[in-house]
Amino acid sequence: MSLTNFSKLFSDLDSNNSTNEKIEILINYFFSNTPLENACTISLLLGKSNKRFISGKKLRIFFSEIFNQPLWLIDICYTKVGDSAEVTSLLLREHLNMKDKSLNEISINRLIKDLLPKLKHLNEEKQKLLLKKIWQNVPKSNLLVLNKIITGSFRIGVSKGIITKSISKFASIDESIISHRLMGELNPTLENYQFLINKSERLEELNYKPYPYQLAKSFDKKIKNF
């Protein structure tokens, strides 16, 4: 699946207040995705892939230099919006025309594992060239999510509980098992994803599985009558 589909998922989840509908949206997304894309999506939603490739401040500076716009004006817009990724995506809409569709269907996996990491290893001039190319070759509707991923500021109003329940229903696995498997680091690899949705419990998982919790109740009978 592509960045376009992930951006639609972001929009659908962000605009929906119903827990049950968010769960259904996620389940449908998982069914329509490849395992590797699901792994990357889960990692992003849980905030485990929020690596900063370029800072928000540098993103604004680069936009200013690439499109010859006064930085002071961009900074004023930033104070009103409060988010570098969002203000830059809004301003970009007035300056971009897709030159080609080479990145139109780029996968989330390729984006966060291959393309964006290159930004960290380039000097500033080459960073600007690559960033401009990326901006020019993705649909405008994807710019907000793209910039949030670039700046490591991707957040969405979906709790870990909703994500856990969605995976549990999607994979038909007990929710407590999914919750345990999501603990700690979760690198978005095919191997980790296959472990996450594996229906068989391993011995060490059973050993650490918590007992069901129940509140204590008062005992109102005489012990000899018990």
Regions found by a protein language model. Name each.
Residues M1-F226:
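N-terminal nucleic-acid-engaging modules of covalent nucleotidyltransferase systems
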